[in-house]
Amino acid sequence: MAELQQLQQLQEFDIPTGREALRGNHSALLRVANYCEDNYLQATDKRKALEETMAFTTQALASVAYQVGNLAGHTLRMLDLQGAALRQVEAKMSTLGQMVNMHMEKVARREIGTLATVVRLPSNQKVIPPESLPSLTPYHRKPLNFACLDDIGHGVKDLSTQLSRTGTLSRKSIKAPATPVSATLGRPPRIPEPVQLPAVPDGKLSAASSASSLASAGSAEGASGIPQSKGQVAPATPPPPPVAPVTPPPPPLSAEVFLPPPPLEVSQPPLEAELPLPPPPALEGDELGLLPPPPPGFGPDEPSWVPASYLEKVVTLYPYTRQKDNELSFSEGTVICVTRRYSDGWCEGVSSEGTGFFPGNYVEPSC
């Protein structure tokens, strides 16, 4: 407490008083200097005036030196007291830190001891029955109801297999018969008619069979329209009958009605004599497409700047101007021998310009 009171007295009284005394001596010394100058100029005895001036000067210097020394001593004393106070605060903070560390170590040891404790469960609590069992609903047998499936799917019957057995052209064939085939009943061969989409009731063709019949009919007509050669004249195909709104079901099969034979392959018209291709025009010596020269550094002889060992050769895609002294500057198409790669994307290599670093996304491997 005494040190704190002394420090407070120095800061509030002694040091400000010494500073005010120095300011007062400054103004007093100015007045003494003016007096001595006037006295020396007006005095008849210059020797006596000079001695008087020297005495005033000695007294003023002694007074100023005393006041400066006193103020400096007070300032040093204040600094010493402040250093001692700071050391006390530092010691207290160190003590508090040690206490906190000790407390944390105690807590950690307590937790470690808690985790290391063996928990032994009593042997009589292996199975704990529930407090109340849920009530079970008695089973009642219910008949199956298939009416819930009425709105699922569609009820259209597929008769595509039956149509394939009743004289319809094969769906996989795209060829037409070369000669007309006479039917058993004396009528011209029947051209398959395009089938329209039937209604929903049973006994009609499905959408899939109708689409396939249309595709087969169109393919048969397209195949029959191939032009014949001059030596072979195919008979004209009769026009198809008008399309009925709804195609009637096919007639029932009997022993007297036979299916027409499968259509024969239509002979392709002989191709005209192929003329030989004209020879390519003769190229002059200056019109020959010579290969472009390889980039520098890819000749049979390696340049002198290529190092003895390197990872690979790369070609620059874009020009780059170095930002630091240890980087490379290059233009587009420059060949660089990579000697080292870094994880940040930069590479180190050697080019005809020198050795340095360059960004790895400016180059691509050479072919």
From Swiss-Prot:
Tell me which residues bear Phosphoserine: S216, S219, S343
The protein's GO terms of the molecular function aspect are: actin filament binding; identical protein binding
Q: Indicate the principal place this protein occupies in or around the cell.
A: cytoplasm
- Bias class Pro residues marks the residues at 236-264
Q: Indicate the segments forming the SH3 domain, all copies.
A: 309-367
Superkingdom to which the source organism belongs? Eukaryota
Alphabetically, which GO biological process terms does the record hold?
actin cytoskeleton organization; defense response to tumor cell; modification of postsynaptic actin cytoskeleton; negative regulation of lamellipodium assembly; negative regulation of protein localization to plasma membrane; positive regulation of cellular senescence; regulation of cell migration; regulation of dendritic spine morphogenesis
Task: Identify the stretch(es) annotated as Disordered.
Answer: 163-273
GO CC annotations, alphabetized: dendritic shaft; dendritic spine; glutamatergic synapse; lamellipodium; postsynaptic density; SCAR complex
Q: Keywords in alphabetical order, please.
A: Coiled coil, Cytoplasm, Phosphoprotein, SH3 domain
Instruction: Relate the assembly described in the record.
Output: May interact with PAK1 and PAK2. Probably interacts with TARSH.
- The protein's role, per its UniProt record: Inhibits ectopic tumor cell metastasis of SRD cells. In vitro, reduces cell motility.
Record's family? Belongs to the ABI family.
Name-wise, this protein is: ABI gene family member 3
Originating organism:
Mus musculus (Mouse)
Q: Which gene encodes it?
A: Abi3
